[in-house]
């Protein structure tokens, strides 16, 4: 460009830099020199392809770090005289035109120079770009190819068996899967072949045709086993309607993920929507189109063109959502084929000369249940597995496909209701559980309004975790040796007592009772074993990863949860002990202090209620035990097993031991998340809402020498009232008898559950049952009638003590209940918007029934009706509203911590960060709590009710106290 511009100037013989020019002609000269001298090409050489020009005096060469202006051109131009009279008059315009072009070119070079000066983005999500894209490819494969991988593994093993003519030595459950795979796959394929003959006559045919038979077989087997492991009805049994729905959902999901492979063009049979009939297109054509699409996707994947891949999926994803009716029809048919073709055979030594005992692995049964608090009973179909399948169920986790594993790279940022988190697996920002009104409101809410919620969920999802290999290794050792340690369930069943002779009716009656108790205990153990196996299998899958992430979403109230269901930080002590932050930070002086406090908190047993200095003293007095726990966790004194949270305590012991043994303890690296927990957090929110001084004192909204314990204070109030009642005359005051009996029973543990659940609107009957359970555990009274009446009295006194201490909370709860009652009486659901802009709709509506005829039986699907459950809307509003506030506080804290450079994880009312950052997090969480409650929350709520329901008259807001919220900023034990 420069060559062209200056070349044109020389050809026109423009005398534009002559010494004899007038003052007017010096303007272009100065302008040119200004342009040329201002072009800072420093450092551009590497970024741009600019070759030096050596003509007409030459362009001085560019040097790295320097810039020379075009001095030679000025000299040459001065030597040129015009020989054309017309050039004299037109020269000025020509020069200006050339200078304008030079200015444009200069700006272009400057722009390129600025871009070249910016280093390329070689770090993404804290890792090199190449590594990030490699992990991204793995993540996409994890989401899209797991079922295909499982099916391929079965095919390969079967092919290998045919070739070798030998049965491979496989684990028990894997051999079952393999034995079922071929007959189930063939049965499904027979169905698919039949569909081609009976076109349009089988209602579920168009759905099943969209996936290969082997993949449907694998999905059916794995989903069924997963449901039998984790189902609410008990291990080894699952409601047919639940199983059919979930298997149908899984098949639909896999069709959706892989739709671009079978829907390459609209002429293909599998491009039909659910309302169209499949055309008889040859398998060869479908295979060619599938392979073509597969290659296209592979090329895009190799180039990290994920957006193009997703666009391709959307382009070919033309089918409509199936709907629950279609899902259960597909699921029921697949379950039927599984039951008809999956068999099990006891080991050969279990039978003598007779034929082998081959029997179905699964069978359909019917159960009758009485609905809670009613005399109505309902019969439902269920699927049960054979005892031999049940026997291996708790060992099957390692052979199962587990969907929604933690992600290898940060989740996609949330940008819409179903846009965010996973790349291909369906992800929704809110768990609506089929509540149509909530789903509709969420979809209609402007993105800008939801930005604070999205940012908080993205922040939680971007926290990087890893497996604590030392703790996992120990857990595996304990589990391999039968469990029973650190809260792990016994891997062996309780022996069932032998049946006695029926002549002795008393013995037989006792045997039936003991047998029933043993069977129940074994079922509970089995369920716990399955749960632990699933958690450990996820840990084993992720242990060699450098790090991983948990995408989060919210429930309808706005509380955040990880999408992955098994191994996450919201789980048990086992989960939390196995997990740690991926990033390590030096402890520092403050971090070393907090690590010691953390050990005392995890040990608990009253130690966690002491002042901080006393907790530190406790830890320091047990350093020998801590070192021993770290060095010889099983062979030593096992001090860590006495902790309330043993595996988390062990992880902290290992970290503290490493730090104290290093030359510079404060420089030791820590990955342990340190917890700061709220003090009966629901009551903290009530005290702040009501500006309640007495309540604020009880739940640490104001500072004290040591943490206030609300449970102990309530117990003390209860005891004081009972002491007064015990002095009354039983003749005139019958409760005096129960007061005397209860005096020795009142303690923190007796009232704790009732105080905790008071936030959730615990009723008198609920409190009575809680206290009765505690008394039965202690074996206080042999007479059941006496236990019942004593519990009634104690519940009444406990609720009275709570109302006295938290008067403002009681008034606010009553106001919540009154408002909800009025709204629900008009057949409206209670709705509100959280301080972060999340719309909340209470989902409690009377269920309707929809009958669906399947190949197994007529199934009853639950359908939401327009009629609200008025009482549930009323009783649930107070706790749901408080939960929406604690969710808002956690999200506000998460975002602020992230902006301050802290790693953050949250479990509702428990906030976690690195030891060295606890002080900063403590400051932030207090500031955010004050910021939250400085807003007119109740006033805004009332205003929203009045706008939504203008024809309803609402009661006035309750009176509030004069507690100074700013005191929270100075409260040492607000969260501790």
Swiss-Prot record:
Pfam family, one: RNA_pol
Biological processes annotated in GO: DNA-templated transcription
EC number: 2.7.7.6
SUPFAM superfamilies: DNA/RNA polymerases (SSF56672)
Signal peptide: none
SMART domains assigned to the protein according to its UniProt record, in alphabetical order: RPOL_N (SM01311)
Assigned protein family: Belongs to the phage and mitochondrial RNA polymerase family.
Protein name (database record): DNA-directed RNA polymerase 1, mitochondrial
Organism the protein comes from: Arabidopsis thaliana (Mouse-ear cress)
Originating gene: RPOT1
């Amino acid at each position: 460009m420069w060559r062209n511009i200056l070349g044109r100037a020389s050809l026109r013989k423009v005398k534009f830099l002559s010494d004899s020019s007038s003052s007017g002609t010096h303007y272009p000269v100065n302008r040119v020199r200004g342009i040329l001298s201002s072009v800072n090409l420093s450092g551009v050489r590497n970024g741009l392809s600019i070759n030096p020009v050596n003509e007409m005096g030459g362009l001085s060469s560019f040097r790295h770090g320097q810039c020379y202006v075009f001095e030679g051109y000025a000299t040459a131009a001065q030597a040129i005289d015009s020989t054309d009279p017309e050039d004299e008059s037109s020269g000025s315009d020509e020069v200006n035109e050339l200078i304008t072009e030079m200015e444009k070119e200069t700006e272009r070079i400057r722009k390129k120079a600025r871009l070249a000066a910016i280093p390329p983005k070689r770090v993404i999500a804290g890792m090199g770009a190449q590594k990030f894209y490699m992990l991204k490819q793995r993540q996409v494969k994890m989401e899209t190819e797991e079922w295909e991988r499982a099916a391929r593994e079965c095919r390969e093993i079967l092919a290998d068996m045919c070739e070798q003519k030998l049965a491979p030595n496989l684990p028990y459950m894997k051999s079952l899967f393999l034995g079922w795979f071929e007959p189930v796959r063939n049965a499904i394929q027979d169905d698919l072949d039949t569909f081609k003959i009976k076109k349009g006559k089988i209602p579920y045919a168009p759905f099943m045709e969209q996936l290969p038979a082997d993949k449907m077989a694998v999905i059916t087997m794995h989903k069924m086993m997963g449901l039998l492991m984790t189902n609410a009805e008990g291990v080894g049994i699952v409601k047919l309607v639940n199983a059919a729905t979930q298997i149908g959902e899984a098949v639909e999901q896999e069709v959706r993920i892989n739709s671009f492979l079978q829907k390459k063009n609209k002429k293909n049979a599998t491009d039909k929507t659910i309302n169209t009939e499949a055309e008889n297109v040859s398998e060869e054509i479908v295979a060619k189109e599938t392979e073509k699409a597969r290659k296209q996707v592979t090329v895009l994947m190799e180039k990290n063109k994920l957006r193009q891949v997703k666009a391709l999926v959307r382009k070919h994803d033309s089918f409509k959502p199936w709907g629950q009716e279609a899902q259960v029809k597909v699921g029921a048919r697949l379950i039927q084929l599984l039951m008809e073709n999956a068999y099990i055979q006891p080991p050969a030594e279990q039978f003598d000369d007779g034929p082998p005992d081959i029997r179905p692995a699964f069978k359909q049964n019917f159960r009758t249940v009485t609905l809670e608090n009613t005399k109505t009973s309902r019969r439902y179909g269920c699927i049960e597995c054979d005892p031999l399948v049940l026997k291996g169920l708790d060992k099957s986790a390692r052979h199962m496909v587990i969907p929604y594993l933690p992600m290898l790279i940060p989740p996609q940022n949330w940008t819409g209701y179903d846009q965010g988190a996973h790349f291909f697996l369906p992800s929704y920002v809110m768990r609506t559980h089929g509540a149509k009104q909530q789903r509709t409101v969420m979809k209609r809410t402007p993105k800008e309004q939801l930005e604070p919620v999205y940012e908080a969920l993205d922040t939680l999802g971007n926290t990087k975790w890893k497996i604590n290999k030392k703790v996992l290794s120990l857990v595996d050792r304990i589990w391999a040796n039968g469990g029973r340690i650190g809260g792990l369930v016994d891997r062996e069943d309780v022996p069932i007592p032998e049946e006695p002779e029926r002549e002795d009716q008393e013995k037989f009656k006792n045997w039936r009772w003991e047998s029933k108790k043993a069977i129940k205990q074994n079922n509970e153990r089995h369920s716990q074993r399955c749960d632990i196996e699933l958690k450990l299998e996820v840990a084993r899958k992720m242990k060699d990863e450098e790090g991983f992430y948990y995408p989060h979403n919210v429930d309808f109230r706005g509380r955040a949860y990880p999408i992955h269901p098994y191994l996450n930080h919201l789980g048990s002590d086992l989960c939390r002990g196995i997990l740690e932050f991926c990033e390590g930070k030096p402890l520092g002086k403050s971090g070393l202090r907090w690590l010691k406090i953390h050990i005392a908190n995890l040990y608990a047993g009253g130690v966690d209620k002491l002042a901080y200095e006393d907790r530190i003293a406790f830890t320091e007095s047990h350093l020998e035990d801590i070192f021993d726990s770290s060095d010889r966790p099983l062979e030593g004194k096992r001090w860590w097993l006495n902790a309330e949270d043993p595996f988390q305590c062990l992880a902290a012991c290992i970290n503290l031991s490493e730090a104290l043994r290093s030359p510079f303890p404060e420089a030791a690296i820590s990955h342990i998340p340190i917890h700061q927990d709220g003090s009966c957090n629901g009551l903290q929110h009530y005290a702040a809402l009501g500006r309640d001084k007495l309540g604020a004192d009880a739940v640490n909204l104001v500072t004290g020498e040591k943490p206030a314990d609300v449970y102990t204070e309530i117990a003390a109030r209860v005891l004081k009232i009972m002491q007064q009642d015990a002095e009354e005359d039983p003749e005139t005051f019958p409760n005096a008898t129960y007061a005397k009996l209860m005096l020795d029973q009142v303690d923190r543990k007796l009232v704790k559950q009732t105080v905790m659940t008071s936030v959730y609107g615990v009723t008198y009957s609920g409190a009575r049952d809680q206290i009765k359970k505690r008394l039965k555990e202690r074996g206080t009274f042999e007479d059941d009638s006496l236990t019942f009446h004593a519990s009634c009295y104690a519940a009444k006194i406990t609720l009275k003590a709570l109302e006295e201490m938290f008067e403002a909370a009681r008034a606010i709860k009553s106001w919540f209940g009154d408002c909800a009652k009025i709204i629900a009486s008009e057949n409206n659901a209670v709705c509100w918007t959280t301080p972060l802009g999340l719309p909340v709709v209470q989902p409690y509506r009377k269920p309707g029934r929809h009958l669906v005829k399947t190949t197994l039986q007529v199934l009853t699907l639950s359908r939401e009706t327009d009629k609200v459950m008025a009482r549930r809307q009323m009783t649930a509003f107070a706790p749901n509203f408080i939960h929406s506030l604690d969710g808002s506080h956690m999200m506000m804290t998460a975002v602020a911590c992230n902006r301050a450079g802290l790693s953050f994880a949250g479990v509702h009312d428990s906030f976690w960060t690195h030891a060295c950052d606890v002080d900063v997090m403590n400051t932030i969480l207090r500031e955010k709590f004050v910021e939250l409650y400085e807003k007119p929350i109740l006033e805004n709520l009332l205003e929203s009710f009045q706008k939504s329901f203008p024809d309803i008259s609402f009661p006035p807001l309750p009176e509030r106290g004069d507690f100074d919220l700013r005191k929270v900023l100075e409260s040492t034990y607000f969260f501790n």
